[in-house]
Amino acid sequence: MSEEIKKDDLQEEVEATETEETVEEVIEEIPEKSELELANERADEFENKYLRAHAEMQNIQRRSSEERQQLQRYRSQDLAKAILPSLDNLERALAVEGLTDDVKKGLEMTRDSLIQALKEEGVEEVEVDSFDHNFHMAVQTLPADDEHPADSIAEVFQKGYKLHERLLRPAMVVVYN
């Protein structure tokens, strides 16, 4: 019996040793795989970070370019807003009766040269065909009738202007309602 116990103990030791060796081999293989997997994961992570940083840089450059174009396009906005009251005064002066022909001609030439300079910068007069709340400000309303349909403009108190598609000043109008 003691021989059997010894054999069993010996066999258990051999099995335990084999199991330990197998476990050690598996453990040794796992760290190698894990290190490779970790390296691949880190490489993927760095690649993703690089791609995101590159895309962000391209977006910044695109936005910067668009902002420069917008600034260039609307660079004369403040100057145009400052000139519009002078243009209004010229219009009022031309509306005065009793001006000599020479004075009237001089005022018209000055007005026309200002309008031309503003047009070259992209400033346009707002159209007053029919009322549009985006471009017109109703300062008074009149009742609509058969001759004057609703939302038609009766009178323009002050002209409106826009720079390209951006409104500088709405036209102040009387509207049939």
Curated annotation (Swiss-Prot):
Subcellular location(s) per record? Cytoplasm
Gene Ontology CC: one annotated term: cytoplasm
Q: Positions of the region Disordered?
A: 1-26
The answer to whether the entry has keyword Chloroplast is no
Is the keyword Cytoplasm assigned to this protein? yes
Query: Which terms does the record give in the GO molecular function aspect?
Result: adenyl-nucleotide exchange factor activity; protein homodimerization activity; protein-folding chaperone binding; unfolded protein binding
Q: Which InterPro entries match?
A: GrpE, GrpE_coiled_coil, GrpE_head
Write out the entry's keywords from A to Z: Chaperone, Cytoplasm, Stress response
One GO biological-process annotation of the entry reads: protein folding
Q: Chief localization class?
A: cytoplasm
Q: Where is the composition biased (Acidic residues)?
A: 10-26
Function summary: Participates actively in the response to hyperosmotic and heat shock by preventing the aggregation of stress-denatured proteins, in association with DnaK and GrpE. It is the nucleotide exchange factor for DnaK and may function as a thermosensor. Unfolded proteins bind initially to DnaJ; upon interaction with the DnaJ-bound protein, DnaK hydrolyzes its bound ATP, resulting in the formation of a stable complex. GrpE releases ADP from DnaK; ATP binding to DnaK triggers the release of the substrate protein, thus completing the reaction cycle.
| Record text on subunit structure and interactions | Homodimer.
Give the protein family: Belongs to the GrpE family.
Return the protein name: Protein GrpE
Instruction: Give the originating organism.
Output: Streptococcus agalactiae serotype Ia (strain ATCC 27591 / A909 / CDC SS700)
Task: Point out the gene that encodes the protein.
Answer: grpE
